[in-house]
Amino acid sequence: MKNKYIEQFEAKQIEGKNVPDFRAGDTLKLAIRIKEGDKTRIQNFEGICIARRGNGVSETFIVRKIGANNVGVERIFPIYSESLESITVLRRGRVRRARLFYLRDRRGKAARIKELKK
């Protein structure tokens, strides 16, 4: 059981955030606030969510994209991070796993995920 003060603090952190419902296999577009010196700017990061773990304030997710020269780039984000401006779900993926770490070994068309039909 958590301390009531910790629970209040965590509830305050989660309070203002509007997080869409997404899971592993979904293609996400993230708007990340980056601070360089005294300036801040928004950088977009688009990729496939390959894992989601934890709960509450400490919940994180991993997004993987294939960058220049077919180099895979993975970033781990806390869901309730202040640096995340927005999370947009571009497409829903049809997968049968909660962790898609096998995509790390795949290249090209083999790394694609089928879209979920509604």
Swiss-Prot record:
This protein is located at the 30S-50S ribosomal subunit interface and may play a role in the structure and function of the aminoacyl-tRNA binding site. The keyword Transcription does not apply. GO terms for molecular function: structural constituent of ribosome. It comes from the Bacteria. InterPro entries: Ribosomal_bL19 (IPR001857), Ribosomal_bL19_CS (IPR018257), Ribosomal_bL19_sf (IPR038657), Translation_prot_SH3-like_sf (IPR008991). The gene is rplS. GO terms for biological process: translation. This is Large ribosomal subunit protein bL19. Keywords: Ribonucleoprotein, Ribosomal protein. NCBIfam families: rplS_bact. Transmembrane segments: none annotated. The keyword Ubl conjugation does not apply. Belongs to the bacterial ribosomal protein bL19 family. PROSITE patterns: RIBOSOMAL_L19 (PS01015). Coiled coil: none annotated. Pfam families: Ribosomal_L19 (PF01245). SUPFAM superfamilies: Translation proteins SH3-like domain.
